[in-house]
């Protein structure tokens, strides 16, 4: 069986495969594969994590397995996922490993790998690790074990890297920024980056206790940030998720600036406009229309930063992302980086001398309605001619003014019916009509 999903290995801590025993075996299996594929006799792996309590247990197990396989490990401590990607390259490591479940609650955790280039591990290497996991853990040579050391300046290295992506002749001296750290991996480095560039920073949710990561805070719960920006009279707010690979922002009036807004700013307001942008099937149609008017290319990928990255590489572009706040700027970083994405927006604000709300003044998201249709048993909506006819009819009705998206959930018997368009009432009516059509056909089936 394959333990790897689209974003590494993830699950509830204490249940397979997120257990100390499995992490030990995984470290050993990965170490064996890295030794075979490494030009060095003793390959180096950098290992970082977010702030979950279970991360410390998994870290100990992983490093023990890696050391037993003869791999040297540099322990980075709690740091954003993109920081691990950067330090994998900066420290000339053969691979990087992150222990994190991103925006999930504290009781979940995950393990994912980066290649020596700071990119997601190739599928071929993941398959080799899977095969190695089927073997017994057997230490052949006790004279050639690896060892682990803690990197004491990891935070500083990453802070300097982030600052290097912000124009050296710019500063943030006149800005007051509220930063929501989600009690996560950016709790220290996030506020530090903006302070060192001159901003007055109000840090929120920056006291992790191992259990409060993402709890009613961060990019998935920006409500308290929206309130805090107004209360503090700040110029803007920035919210990360637990591992700081997602970011959403808030203007001085408390309005939310999501991933679609950020892509709009980077694609149409920046001094150097990109040739094209990659969104996903969830990107609002308003973004597609705005980019077309600005003569900026646009393509949609499947949901997931892995697919956004793939589409960027296929098109030779550097800018892409998702409404959730996964933003990739491949000319700055190899993976989605919340701090760097925020800095790119701040760069546009400084170079144009405009407030955040002014940058999106002409950009209005189309009304969007999402209806989750729960079924007794999953069905494929596109295998039923009557439903396909309804979908086609709806698409024809919205032609040029909106769109529909019908998706099956990958984890539960739910059909997601999404409709968006330029008329809110029409969108609501159409979404409910299509949802009812799915319900009716499910009863017939």
Curated annotation (Swiss-Prot):
Care to name a GO molecular-function term for this sequence? phosphomannomutase activity
Keywords associated with the record: Isomerase, Magnesium, Metal-binding, Phosphoprotein
For the modification Phosphoserine, which residues carry it? Answer: 102
Q: What is its EC number?
A: 5.4.2.10
Q: In this entry, which stretches build a coiled coil?
A: none
| Keyword presence, Lipid biosynthesis | no
Enzyme class comes to: isomerase
**Domain of life, per lineage:** Bacteria
The residues listed in the UniProt record as binding Mg(2+), with positions renumbered to this chain, are 102, 241, 243, 245
Cellular component (GO) terms are:
cytosol
- List the NCBIfam families hit by this protein, alphabetically: glmM, PRK10887.1
Q: What family is this protein classified in? A: Belongs to the phosphohexose mutase family.
- Name of the protein in its database record: Phosphoglucosamine mutase
What is the originating organism of this protein? Acinetobacter baumannii (strain ACICU)
């Amino acid at each position: 069986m394959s333990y790897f999903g689209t974003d590494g290995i993830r699950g509830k801590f204490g249940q397979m495969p997120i257990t100390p025993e499995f992490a030990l075996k995984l470290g050993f299996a990965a170490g064996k594969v890295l030794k075979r594929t490494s030009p060095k006799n003793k390959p180096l792996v950098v290992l970082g994590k977010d702030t979950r309590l279970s991360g410390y247990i998994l870290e100990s197990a992983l490093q023990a397995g890696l050391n037993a396989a003869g791999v040297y490990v540099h322990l980075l401590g709690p740091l954003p996922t993109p920081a691990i990607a950067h330090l994998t390259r900066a420290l000339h490591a053969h691979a990087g490993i992150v222990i994190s479940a991103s925006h999930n609650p504290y009781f979940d955790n995950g393990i994912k790998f980066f290649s020596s280039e700071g990119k997601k591990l190739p599928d071929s290497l993941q398959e080799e690790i899977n095969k190695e996991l089927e073997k017994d853990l057997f230490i052949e040579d006790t004279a050639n074990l690896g060892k682990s050391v803690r990197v004491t300046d990891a935070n500083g290295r990453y802070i300097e890297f982030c600052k290097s992506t912000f124009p050296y002749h710019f500063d943030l001296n006149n800005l007051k920024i509220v930063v929501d750290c989600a009690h996560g991996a950016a709790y220290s480095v996030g506020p530090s980056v903006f302070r060192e560039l001159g901003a007055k920073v109000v840090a929120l949710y920056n006291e992790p206790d191992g259990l409060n990561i993402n709890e009613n805070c961060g990019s998935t719960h920006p409500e308290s940030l929206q309130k805090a920006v107004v209360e503090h009279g700040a110029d803007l707010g920035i919210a990360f998720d637990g591992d700081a690979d997602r970011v959403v922002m808030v203007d001085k009036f408390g309005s939310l600036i999501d991933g679609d807004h950020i892509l709009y700013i980077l694609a149409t307001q920046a001094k150097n406009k990109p040739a094209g942008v990659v969104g996903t099937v969830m990107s609002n149609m308003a973004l597609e229309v705005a980019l077309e008017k600005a003569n900026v290319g646009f393509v949609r990928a499947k949901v997931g930063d892995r697919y956004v990255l793939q589409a960027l590489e296929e098109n030779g572009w550097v800018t892409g992302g998702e409404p959730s706040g996964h933003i990739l700027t491949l000319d700055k970083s190899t993976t989605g980086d919340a701090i760097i994405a925020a800095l790119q927006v701040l760069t546009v604000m400084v170079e144009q001398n405009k407030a955040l709300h002014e940058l999106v003044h002409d950009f209005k998201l189309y009304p969007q309605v999402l209806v989750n249709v729960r079924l007794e048993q999953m069905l494929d909506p596109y295998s039923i001619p009557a439903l396909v006819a309804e979908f086609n009819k709806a698409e024809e009705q919205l032609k040029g003014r909106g769109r529909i998206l019908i998706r099956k959930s990958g984890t539960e018997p739910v059909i997601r019916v999404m409709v968006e368009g330029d008329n809110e009432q029409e969108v609501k009516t159409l979404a409910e009509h299509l949802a009812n059509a799915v319900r009716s056909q499910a009863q017939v089936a």
